[in-house]
Amino acid sequence: MENEENSLGKEYKDGNIIFKENSIGKEMYIILSGKVKVIKERDGVETTLAILDEGDFFGEMSLFDNYPRSATVKAIGNVKVLEINQKSFLKKVSKDPTLAFRMLEKMSQRIRKMDEWVLSYAVKAQDLVNESQNYA
């Protein structure tokens, strides 16, 4: 059995997959304890996109769209997460609307970080193109 479930959440052991890229899900997760890594795998090469810690959340996009998961999430060491489905999320937001604001704030930070990452790679790619043209 990959994980253990109790009333306070689900527990995962080191290396256990919480969900896989391209799987279908309608839940998000909040890390109660431990760390997870968010990864993409291409041609057998695993790239770590993020390391998330206690208090962080992941899988939230599945609450808002019908697309498959965009990455795989694995436990680093022992991890305990709280799983929240769409119905529970909407209930929590109706009781505490600031929850939605805090999530949007965190998602905005992630988008800004991704923008910076994409820009840095675009600059590197342009530099390579410029260098190769110098040798032509």
Would you name each region that the model predicts?
Residues 1-136:
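Cytosolic regulatory regions built on CNB/CRP/Popeye-like sensor folds
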